[in-house]
Structure formats: C-alpha cells, structure tokens
C-alpha cells in the first residue's frame, strides 16, 4: 500500500478541499470541509477534526495549505510576495501557524493599469499548471484563470511578472441574484450555447464600448421578445466574458497573438473562455483546474525544506 507523505488543502472562502497524498502527489483519500469564512477563528480545530484519522494512521504528517488560510481573516496571514516573482520561490516563504503546518503566500503586483493587485491561491494553481503544461516555464506566456475573480497572469521563463484581476464571475452572480436585468427570481440559471454566442457577438461588435452601456440589453431584448427569459443569463455571461477578453488582450499585447493563451479552469469555464478568445482571434489551450492547486502543493512540498514530505 502506498504510504501517505503529507496532507494538502485548498482552503477557499466557501469550501475546503483536503487530500491525503503520497510523496509523488498522488491523492490517496480526499474530503471537504467548511470554507475560510465559516472556519474563521477555528482553523486548527476544523483541520484537526477532518484529519484526525489520517494522523492516527501516520502521526505528524506535514500539511500544506493554499488559498484563504493565509488571508487577513485566515489562520495566519502569509504576506504577499511582490512581483516579479519566480513562482518556485514561494516554497521558501511559507507561513507556519504551528509546527508542521505550512501556508503558501499570495503575490502582489502593479497591474497593467497601474493599480495594485493581489492573488491568493492562483499562484499555486500556476505552479500546478507547470506540471501539466511545461511550456509555461519557457518564454512569454499569458495564462487565464477564470472564476469569481478571473486572473490574467503574465509569465516569463517561470517568473510571474504581473497580473490583472477582473471580477467577471462576481459581477455575473450579482446581476443574476440581485438585479431585474437578467432574470426573475423563478427563472433558473442554465447554459444556452446559442445565447452565449450572441452575447460574445455583442461584445465583439462594439469592442470599444464599456460593458455598462450594454447591460440593459439583457432586459430590453427580452421585453422585445428577441431573447428568451431562459437564455438571458447566458447572453449576459457571453457579454461579460467577451468584454473581459476584449479589454484584457491589448493590455498584454507584448505576448504576441501567435502564442496561445493557457486557460486553467474547470472544463465548462475553459470552454467558455476558449470560445471568447477564438471570437477575438486568439488560440488557447486548456489545463484542468480541478487538480491544479494540488499539483502545485505537491511541487511546493518537494521544494520546501528537505525531508518535509519524506
């Protein structure tokens, strides 16, 4: 039987994913728990409760955590590392709330718009993506990590130069849950590919017009019976993602249109962003995001002080 070497955890705001891992990163067991918002003030108790049986079988397993465990409301704040940052070097700056527990720091930069920007958790996903797509460690690369707060990361030879955060997912959720523009409360949020493509087309038709000037179309098109109530959310998603892509690509023009954009996300999000990038003439390659954080934690466990995951 393969021996357990360490425990890995991706501690998001709303969910905790834990894996018992072998030395090579293979997941032996997995489980879930409360996110950082719910675990606030009791991180140690939550972790110990979820991993008690794992530690009973092999005491003193080292733990590697990424995400919000290192935030200002986390277990112990892991200060942001400034960009440019060689991503492998995060393994040398782990925060330790207690012996045996290691929290990956986030990164900060001045983004292409000249404003401060931060990421926490995505740096570990980027490290994990290196294992699946080694070309990311060579030359200039543009990586898209879609989500609630989509990150666009600029890399050069494995060094994170800068990044840009676009709250595309959060804006979409706010519009769906708290606005009359997209849907009535009784209308479910479903994906309709045709309406999503229509939203992308609208984003491409007037690329210089801000998204704020076009959001009301989600309602007016429905009232004019040019858009179904069921398809309005997908149309809005297409408009938002299309505008995200259209606004971002010029900011990272130094990467060149010939270099594919790497998308690190779930299969469904990869497909949506790939369609948007194609609409604006960019090729893309997809990396499964579900396991990227754990692949990154596996790499960090090997790069950290000798023997920590032995």
Name each model feature, range by range.
Residues 5-44, 287:
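Short glycine-rich, Thr/Ser-proximal phosphate-binding strand/loop in the N-terminal lobe
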Residues 6-10, 62-64, 141-145, 262-263:
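Short glycine-aspartate micro-motif
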Residues 15, 257-276:
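Glycine-rich phosphate-binding loops at beta-strand->alpha-helix junctions
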Residues 26-62, 70-77, 181-184:
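N-terminal phosphate-binding loop and adjacent alpha-helix
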Residues 35, 39, 110-204:
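Glycine-rich phosphate-binding loop plus the immediately following alpha-helix
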Residues 54-116, 157:
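Short beta-strand-loop/turn "lid" adjacent to the catalytic site in phosphate-handling enzymes
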Residues 204-247:
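Adenine-nucleotide phosphate-binding core of ATP-dependent small-molecule kinases
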Residues 275, 286-310:
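Glycine-rich phosphate-binding/hydrolytic loop that grips phosphoryl groups
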